[in-house]
Amino acid sequence: MSKFDYLIVGAGLFGSVFAYEATQRGKKCLVIDKRNHIAGNIYTENIEGINVHKYGAHIFHTSDKAIWEYVNRFADFNNFINSPIASYKDELYNLPFNMNTFSKMWGIKTPAEAKAIIAGQIANLNIGEPKNLEEQALKLVGTDVYEKLIKGYTQKQWGRPCTELPAFIIKRLPLRFTYDNNYFNDRYQGIAIGGYTQIIEKMLAGSDVKTDTDYFEFIKENPDIAEKTVFTGQIDEFFGYRYGALGYRSVRFENEILDTDNYQGNAVVNYTDREVPYTRIIEHKHFEFGKQEKTVISREYSAEWQPGIEPY
């Protein structure tokens, strides 16, 4: 007879929600994770009194009231609004693309002026059916927005020229003709006060948890540990890369503690020119409106993936 009803591989958000719901229904769960901590990619670590998002910025947002009420069982959320900034050759632009962006780029004031400029640029390009991502983006937003805010950033993310990327990667690029810097359109939005790790800790309180545990080694030694397995890792790895590895990318994070109370004045700044090696800088204290004397920043570098490093 198995010791557990469920072996859950991965202590991230999906695995932890499953474990919580299962234990609430009287099931016995063992949750394992190959990392040395729980919470997966939403893991936050307190550094200098600042909750640092160790795997990139995570802003919770939803329009579903039931989901919002559910996560608020495990943590209080603040009213943070995601309003990233793009830096291109020392000029700053608001994201997502909106009237603040267009006003800075072209010195205009009205939606009609912005629409006319974009439409004119698209017409001059005379692109038929887009053959690649570059043509797709140009046909959607015109030359200036593409060259300044999309091209370099996208090439850094994917590690190849936009002309070598398929058009289907970008289905649409939202253009807002209002002065609204809110990145999301959802009804509810915020950051867990005190970090996200506490949410996962509470969800896993009724389960057995083992970190630093590789599933493939563990299951060899414990083949009958559970009646059922919930696997939240890489599906290609689960099947032994039988058909080869999927086309992942990876991200390298370079964290730095700085002796200043405010480095960039915003939580997220994207660097969209190709010459800057990183894709963005996150200043974590701004997620919770921190007043600490020091600050922690993370530079993100996109990288080729290979087995043994984190896939994204």
Task: Annotate the PLM regions.
Residues 4-31:
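N-terminal Rossmann-like FAD-binding beta1-loop-alpha1 element of flavoenzymes
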Residues 9-11, 32-34, 62-63, 194, ...:
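Short His-Asn-centered micro-motif
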Residues 23-48:
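Glycine-rich FAD pyrophosphate-binding loop
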Residues 25, 216-312:
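Mid-domain catalytic core of redox enzymes
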Residues 28, 51, 76, 208-210:
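Conserved beta-strand segments of alpha/beta enzyme cores
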Residues 45-70:
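N-terminal glycine-rich dinucleotide-binding loop that anchors FAD/FMN and/or NAD(P) in oxidoreductases
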Residues 67-89, 145-148:
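A short alpha-helix-loop-beta-strand transition element characteristic
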Residues 86-93, 99-228, 232, 236-239:
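Active-site/ligand-binding neighborhood in enzyme catalytic cores
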